[in-house]
Amino acid sequence: MTTLSPEAFAGHTPMMQQYLRIKADHPDTLVFYRMGDFYELFFEDAEKAARLLDLTLTQRGASAGTPIKMAGVPHHAVEQYLAKLVKMGESVAICEQIGDPATSKGPVERKVVRVVTPGTLTDAALLSDKNDVYLLAMCTGHNKRGVAVNIGLAWLNLASGALRLAEIEPDQLAAALERIRPAEILTPDGATDAIPAGAGASKRVPAWHFDIASGTQRLCDQLDVASLDGFGAHSLTSACGAAGALLLYAAATQGQQLRHVRSLKVENETEYIGLDPATRRNLELTETLRGTESPTLYSLLDTCCTTMGSRLLRHWLHHPPRASVAAQSRQQAIGALLDAPANASLDALRSALRQIADVERITGRLALLSARPRDLSSLRDTFAALPALRERIGAIVANADALARVDAALAPPAECLDLLTSAIAPEPAAMVRDGGVIARGYDAELDELRDISENCGQFLIDLEARERARTGIANLRVEYNKVHGFYIEVTRGQTDKVPDDYRRRQTLKNAERYITPELKTFEDKALSAQERALARERALYDSVLQALLPFIPECQRVASALAELDLLAAFAERARALDWVAPTFTDEIGIEIEQGRHPVVEAQVEQFIANDCRFGTERKLLLITGPNMGGKSTFMRQTALIALMAYVGSYVPAKSACFGPIDRIFTRIGAADDLAGGRSTFMVEMTEAAAILNDATPQSLVLMDEIGRGTSTFDGLALAWAIARHLLAHNACYTLFATHYFELTQLPAEFPQAANVHLSAVEHGHGIVFLHAVNEGPANQSYGLQVAQLAGVPAPVIRAARKHLAYLEQQSASQHTPQLDLFSAPPAAVDDLECADAPALPDTPHPALEKLRDIDPDDLKPREALDLLYELRTLVRSHDADGHA
């Protein structure tokens, strides 16, 4: 706790002194200070909140001679304001009144009960149902010379309790953060590690929090183990330092221990198929290139019935396992679900899953003692539904090991269910303060207090009847209001009949209101009973939460099984609805896809042309040529997506598919300027290409699209040619290489492992029809002018382009315009790659033939046809005069 000098409080009121002490402990955090029905912010916090939340900034009095600037939000709407602030990367300390105003002699006692930060969200109102929120800490490991040798990462999903560790090379940080996507990143004070822009809100914490020995011990204490050997984390010293800082920070924000963080997963990069940031972006796994959530592979696959399944799907897509065993187990389960008997049909199973609550997040809130009444009723109803759910899958578990494992994990925790059933009302109120949360019959004292409150009406009816009979006042009434409580009302004309034990409580224009000793006694009992019932209910609810804590591991087990079952059922539904098949796997090098389809594009169009893709030891690179908009990029992406889906465990959009080992997927598709990093489009392209050339292995799948753009034609051609040869000669990876440099189609003559394929188009009238079919051999042209015409480029521009194209093609073979080279001339005989003959340029097409290709005879008038004939003769004579055959 921060200690302030007495001078800091001089002249401040006691309440402001209390606030300043609290604020001193949270200097970089907005403090929501509870005052009655509002959370107030003061001074700089008020100014900042008013700006961020569009609140009214007020000024009320002064403290120590300084005007008190204030802004506030109503307590019942605080969650919507918290959601806005954490989305902006802000943290908020919630300061509640914990003392009783009636007994406080000075300011009501207050303390910070929790700190809401971007990475520590657990409230349902602050969380996205289908996205996990991660808090990540990073700790750099150095050698004896002070050189960074690794970066230890620890990240926690506080809502579920999932904790993971990893150690990576320093240059892998951007890829790791892109995969994890933390909402908040903790780094040591003074650290120089550069966090990529947009990676998450950054928070500096004291460097001693990252002490490796302390972190290791804190991690052991958290997991209740003597050693981390059983988790495979004993050698991850940097990651243990990061974990120590992470656990310390997370516990401090919650103001309590993290009871649900009881296990640890160590992630190794060799465990999953590598996907760098460019690949995740270009394949549009969970986000489109435009930044929208659909249409993506995730949006297509996500037909999950629970939010737990949806979140697990996102995790699986970003973590495809390299070992095919996991994928085969999942696909076996999908097959069993598709072949299930009528009493365990897929539709019936999914219908049952729709009734399941978010057990994972409810368990997290339960562990933090922040679960609300309807969380507990939802947990109860879910556990009650588990036996029927297990009956549905019981008939098919013998056909799938994954389903058998899920079935065993779905055994409901009986004691937990009994407690929830007996303690929680069938339909509880949203908040404990509203009452009606604890079930009748659970506590005798509460039942008695409720009876007093609930039987109030009958007592008043009986009292009114007795008093009318006793006094003879026929219109006497017994009533209640919040200001005066219970009273007996008598009209003016009947007051002479009032008995002596009536005491006047209020005089009205036409009536008098009285209280009697009997009514006063009842009033005291009834009003106190309601307050006592609410207090008793609060105490009972807290005791129920405490009693449920031992069941957290069982709740987590059930949540994990439900998420996996839901996702497997969603995969089965997609396979059935979209006509997908189970892929097969082999240990041999190769990829065989028969009639593959792009899963996302197919869902957006009426008809999709399926295509084959084949790789093997004798076929490692496909040179893809064809027209713009012909489908080259779609074909490339669909190959990568089908491979990824297969290893994730889904069925795939193809007639058949077989995959050998795949360790990484690389893409170099499209690019844009990196303005923030000061890199041009070409520089971005070359950086991505360099990563592929340096890291791709014979088991990597590489997508290269239009490499060499953004510089001069010959520089680009030379680079594309050299990169393609390097991928063949050195990387020997599976490569899809799309290009408009037709000169590269000669590469298979030098490298038999390369093959030409093309996508065709045919001209029809003035237009062009794309066939989208992949055929063997190179394309004959790219139809760039026709595509420009389709895009709406004005006709005069198209005609001018055609003429200039003919001129350029005529000149290109006879002369070469000097250009500024990216490279100096290479020295003689460096190696076989640099000394290899460059591809020869093809013969220039005859200009007369080019002219004829652009003619539609049906559109020519007789005079135009004659003029065209003379023009063609002139082109032929001119061409011959220049020495062409």
UniProtKB/Swiss-Prot annotation:
ATP binds at G626, P627, N628, M629, G630, G631, K632, S633. One of its GO terms (molecular function) is mismatched DNA binding. GO terms for biological process: mismatch repair. InterPro entries: DNA_mismatch_repair_MutS, DNA_mismatch_repair_MutS-lik_N, DNA_mismatch_repair_MutS/MSH, DNA_mismatch_repair_MutS_C, DNA_mismatch_repair_MutS_clamp, DNA_mismatch_repair_MutS_core, DNA_mismatch_repair_MutS_N, DNA_mismatch_repair_MutS_sf. SUPFAM superfamilies: DNA repair protein MutS, domain I, DNA repair protein MutS, domain II, DNA repair protein MutS, domain III, P-loop containing nucleoside triphosphate hydrolases. It comes from the Bacteria. Gene3D superfamilies: 1.10.1420.10, 6.10.140.430, DNA repair protein MutS, domain I, MutS, connector domain, P-loop containing nucleotide triphosphate hydrolases. GO terms for cellular component: cytosol. Keywords: ATP-binding, DNA damage, DNA repair, DNA-binding, Nucleotide-binding. The keyword Transmembrane helix does not apply. This protein is involved in the repair of mismatches in DNA. It is possible that it carries out the mismatch recognition step. This protein has a weak ATPase activity. Belongs to the DNA mismatch repair MutS family. PANTHER family: DNA MISMATCH REPAIR PROTEIN MSH1, MITOCHONDRIAL, DNA MISMATCH REPAIR PROTEIN MUTS FAMILY MEMBER. This is DNA mismatch repair protein MutS. It comes from Burkholderia cenocepacia (strain HI2424).
